[in-house]
Amino acid sequence: MVQKTSMSRGPYPPSQEIPMEVFDPSPQGKYSKRKGRFKRSDGSTSSDTTSNSFVRQGSAESYTSRPSDSDVSLEEDREALRKEAERQALAQLEKAKTKPVAFAVRTNVGYNPSPGDEVPVQGVAITFEPKDFLHIKEKYNNDWWIGRLVKEGCEVGFIPSPVKLDSLRLLQEQKLRQNRLGSSKSGDNSSSSLGDVVTGTRRPTPPASAKQKQKSTEHVPPYDVVPSMRPIILVGPSLKGYEVTDMMQKALFDFLKHRFDGRISITRVTADISLAKRSVLNNPSKHIIIERSNTRSSLAEVQSEIERIFELARTLQLVALDADTINHPAQLSKTSLAPIIVYIKITSPKVLQRLIKSRGKSQSKHLNVQIAASEKLAQCPPEMFDIILDENQLEDACEHLAEYLEAYWKATHPPSSTPPNPLLNRTMATAALAASPAPVSNLQGPYLASGDQPLERATGEHASMHEYPGELGQPPGLYPSSHPPGRAGTLRALSRQDTFDADTPGSRNSAYTELGDSCVDMETDPSEGPGLGDPAGGGTPPARQGSWEDEEEDYEEELTDNRNRGRNKARYCAEGGGPVLGRNKNELEGWGRGVYIR
């Protein structure tokens, strides 16, 4: 019974082995695959695993294969183009050394070149700080100009244009925002950040100061266009129009015209150039307020004088201004003239009082006004002045001034540039103005248009600089609607005879100084007697004497009866025909020879 049951359950004979397929009815299942992954005795893997590894190795080799010939040729072409562009940039840079200065700018921002700035020639970019002065020779492209830093020993290089500086500023601001975002995310778990979030408090920030700071940074352009040569303006020791100040300033002007003969233009400015603020002349709504106010000069007259100063500076000669209305450096701080402020300083108020009293009763009755003006100048920080002349002796003061101006002359006339012929430049400037009467407009605003064009541009040989004013939104050669029509046609350089013949009250716009002419250009009031061209006007003033007292005596001989003119400044050139103001010689004996400070 037992055997029968066992025989019925087992279909195979007892002597036959049981095949392994009975326990694994699906030989292609997951167990067989796992079996294939086992290593053999020699350490190698199964056949299907080995074949897969061969496929993976082949795909990895495809990434590390050598570049194709097309990639190599493309890279070589790029390198060749880069070298060719760099060679052309160097050639253009070399040619620009002998080209005239197209215009000058004063920087409001600093720039330090970095490798990522895409300079046309690496290592030839100009580094500058805020309030530096740059002479621009020409435009290289929309991103770069060619020019030099006005400093002795500096050569021409590439200067970023306002467009380039704005793009660099935007990139820097974007990086700062990203850094702040990353730092704020990483600091979210800090106790201070959590405390701010939970309590809902914010760190106190004065909103008014933040708005003012934002406004000041938004509206400041990178460059201000200034005259190619900074004009020299004398202030102090007191108010202009009074004899003590006029006498001491005249002594310095006489020294300048003899020391820098052929290199300086001295001109008188009667208009109130302190009105030439960018905020006023760029805002038409303020024009009506200025015109309605009881000001000495109209805006049209002020603008005409500014243009004349820019035109004088084009020749790269020194320019000295006898500005009637300028008695304090703050009057010109917001204009684009960027003058060299020379402060004639009298340290002791007692010395100034004695000098004023020595001029007679007509000056003594204005003693308090002059003393107050002197004290106001003395309160200014030294940074507001470029030169402070506090020497006792006239000769020492003159040498101090000459040393500064000689250094400035070397900074503006590098040895690499061809020395220009001022007489030839002035003659050609006359022809250039006649050919194109509309001056190039100012980069910074619509009012400082000097007609600043290279000689090649005036003759049509080189026109690459035509586009540079448009980069800041002002088309070249055009004035805004607020500019009086026909103003540019009145700006012209006159010959010596034209200057003398035009010696009339309305000839300020064309009063130029010619080479070799030691007399400055002055306008004659009809009530003042003979003009510059009159033989009765006398010869040129004598050369600089040894002390301030000697200059005072010369000043007395040349002083005419100007009391009818109020506070207008006395002339530089000697004039006869007018009565000489008397003074008490005994009152001057207390003023020692050459001692005017202590």
Swiss-Prot record:
UniProt domain SH3: residue ranges: 100-169
Lineage top rank: taxon: Eukaryota
Single GO MF descriptor: high voltage-gated calcium channel activity
Biased composition (Acidic residues): 548-559
GO CC term, one of those recorded: L-type voltage-gated calcium channel complex
Positions bearing Phosphoserine: S44, S47, S73, S186, S193, S547
Compositional bias annotation for Polar residues: 54-71
Cellular location(s): Cell membrane, Sarcolemma; Cell membrane
Biased composition (Gly residues): 530-540
Positions of the UniProt region annotated as Disordered: 1-76, 179-223, 466-490, 518-589
Membrane topology recorded in Swiss-Prot or TrEMBL: Peripheral membrane protein
Tissue/organ expression: Detected in heart ventricle (at protein level). Isoform 1 and isoform 3 are expressed in brain, heart, spleen, central nervous system and neuroblastoma cells. Isoform 2 is expressed in skeletal muscle.
Subunit structure as annotated in this protein's UniProt entry: Regulatory subunit of L-type calcium channels that consist of a pore-forming alpha subunit and auxiliary beta, gamma and delta subunits. Interacts with CACNA1A, CACNA1B, CACNA1C and CACNA1S. Component of a calcium channel complex consisting of a pore-forming alpha subunit (CACNA1S) and the ancillary subunits CACNB1 or CACNB2, CACNG1 and CACNA2D1. Identified in a complex with CACNA1C. Identified in a complex with the L-type calcium channel subunits CACNA1C, CACNA2D1, CACNB1 and one of the gamma subunits (CACNG4, CACNG6, CACNG7, or CACNG8).
Family per similarity comment: Belongs to the calcium channel beta subunit family.
Annotated function: Regulatory subunit of L-type calcium channels. Regulates the activity of L-type calcium channels that contain CACNA1A as pore-forming subunit. Regulates the activity of L-type calcium channels that contain CACNA1C as pore-forming subunit and increases the presence of the channel complex at the cell membrane. Required for functional expression L-type calcium channels that contain CACNA1D as pore-forming subunit. Regulates the activity of L-type calcium channels that contain CACNA1B as pore-forming subunit.
Listed name of the protein: Voltage-dependent L-type calcium channel subunit beta-1
